[in-house]
Amino acid sequence: SIMQSSSLVSIISISFISAGLIGLGQGIGIIFGANIGTTTGAWLIAGLGLKVDIATYAMPMLVFGTILMFQSDKKTKGIGYILAGLGFLFLGIAYMKEGFEAFKATLDLTQFAIGGFKGLLIFTFIGILATVIMQSSHATLVLIITALGSGQITYENALALAIGSNIGTTITAVIGSLTSGLEGKKLAGAHVIFNVFT
């Protein structure tokens, strides 16, 4: 949840397994936890970001976060990094909301909506591709939720994009496991299976 990157946690877990620091069961537990933890950002955005003008909270968080980042105490510095990160996240969400709202007048993305099984496959692939390019399922989910909240994509297509995002985040772990031992490959496989079925 703190790292907001299940891909990074997966790669670290595969490295730890390859080095013999943890077992396969522990690695699977870490990956499951990382996958659940990454959803906190999406819940935060869905709960606050689309209902409240979070840009008003972003600037004070950035100011106080920046001030605290330059303190000598490690705890204070850590709080500063967290505040600054949340401030940038909130500001980014606010700008994305404004961007999608501006799109409404000139471009209606719902005209590209595709229903049925064909739409599910196409938008799942787009979600996978977007996540692989951005290297963050969290960033992809932020875009999906923001676009859905502004009415730019249909609910059905948003679900397919989210599924693709969830699957796309496993590709980094699969690539990282290619040079690892058998246990690392098993962990990457567990990561893929977990994300495909959840």
Region locations from a protein language model:
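Transmembrane alpha-helix interface/packing and boundary motifs in multi-pass membrane proteins
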Residues: S1-M3, F125-M134
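Membrane-interfacial helix-loop connectors
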Residues: V9-G37, A42-A55, T131-G168, S177-E183
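Membrane-interface segments at loop-to-transmembrane junctions
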Residues: G20, K77-G85, L109-K118, T131, ...
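Cytoplasmic-side transmembrane-helix entry/capping segments in multi-pass membrane proteins
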Residues: Q26-G33, D53-M59, K77-F88, A188-N195
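Hydrophobic transmembrane alpha-helical segments of multi-pass transport and channel proteins
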Residues: T40, N166, T170-I171, V192-F197
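Membrane-water interface regions at transmembrane-helix termini and the short interhelical loops
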Residues: I45-L48, F64-G78, S180-L182
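Transmembrane alpha-helical segments of multi-pass small-molecule transport proteins
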Residues: I54-I67, T124
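Helix-loop-helix hairpins and the membrane-proximal interhelical loops
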Residues: I82-L129, A147
